[in-house]
Amino acid sequence: MSKQYEFHTHVCADDRAQVVVCGGGTAGTVAAIAAAREGMNVLIIEPFGCLGGSATNSLVTPLMTVGIPGNPMNSSISDEINRRSIEDGFAYQGGINPGYFDPSMMPFLLEQMAQESGVRIRYYTTPIHVIKENDKITALIVQDKAGLHAVEGEIFIDCTGDGDLSVLAGANYTKGNPKTGKNQPISLRYVLDDVDLKAFAGTVSDNSITSDGYSSCVKLHGDREVEKIMTRAMEAGDLTKEDLSYWQVFPLERAGRKGGLACNCPEFFEHVDGTDPAHLTETQILGKIAIRRHLAFYKKYFKGFENAHISNVSAMVGIRESREIETEQIMTFADAAVYRKFDDGIAQTNYPIDVHGMGDEYTCKTVKAEAVNEKPYYEIPYGSLVVKGVDNLLVAGRCIGCEFLVQASIRIQPTCRATGEAAGIAASMAIKNGVLPREINGCAVRARMIENGAVFAEG
């Protein structure tokens, strides 16, 4: 048995905000901006040194599409980010997956928008404990280089991605595939620069690499020419079987990064618990070994990589799924399968149920509605953001209240941004009206989102 220690200390409250957002990532940045634009005093607590989360620290580009005609942004702030990214010259709409952007440039814009809106940011700070009175959070104990501090607030929003704040506050959660107990695979993405993308595409003749340098995910023993090249490399010992289990690249040249190639790999299928520091450490170490192996493979088997070099490696491991927090309403696969709509739906999507895995574990399918003439998308209700058992806590992003298979569909950036905007607006409504988040009418949240410029498909 490990030796146990007791630790007691007095901590001074050195900060306070009406709305405290834990995690300045995909959902958290939007949640904070939304609340600030509603007149709230807002503080973001973020353990890294920039905003954006997976989009920046994990290099996740492009945004992907919600799968609804017109790709409506249920978040006006998300739409603004996309528009301003294009105006700033580091993004473009087009190609097979809309929403390409340079992840190295995104932090500049997100910080600018947060500051324009009056959001305060506290970087390099991590919540480690929650102070509660009955079922209400009164303060967070946070740690930074200067020590321990207390941060007080009225409404708290968990945008940590893994539901860290909710767990600290005592909320229940589920985790992983109920059939296997495993979380979705995790990745360590990287970006190459100075790739001759046309020469790269010219290596194959079957368009398995498009003319601008895009390749959809590679599967082991596939019939496309790029897969045959990779199989030969594996047989020669230049790649491993795991390298072929998932490989995908996205061009960044039209996003203002000449010769840029974003790589959605390597992907790991074991030790995939995003809440286990040993798993995260192993992925960082093994991932870097794999990335160097990938670069050597490109230079040996493809044209266009003569001058290519690694310019970015994810500072944060790419987590697809970890915890799903118990909320007042849980989105089920049955809801998605019948394209269920809710009066208080704060986000809409028809992104596929996208579960990564090896062999038969891999699932990527669009749900099919059973109802005749149903609009081809489902909605996320406001109740999926209201943490059960904690009076003044909302959750947004990929860890909202939903089943594992639904989480595989809602985890993309446009949907996470929409949940963040809804949470920020709901927090401001709760404070202005002196009520708890669970007492807020989700229909009013949706109406306010639309009033602010969010676009919802009619259904």
Residue ranges: model-predicted function:
Residues 8, 16, 34, 40-41, ...:
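Conserved N-terminal/central alpha/beta ligand/cofactor-binding core
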Residues 1-19:
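Extreme N-terminal leader/targeting segments of oxidoreductases
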Residues 23-26:
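Glycine-rich Rossmann-fold phosphate-binding loop(s) that bind the pyrophosphate
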Residues 2, 10, 54, 81, ...:
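Flavin (FAD/FMN)-binding glycine-rich loop and adjacent Rossmann-like elements that form
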Residues 134-140:
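Short, hydrophobic/aromatic-rich segments at coil-to-beta transitions
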Residues 29:
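Residues forming the Rossmann-fold NAD(P)(H) cofactor-binding site
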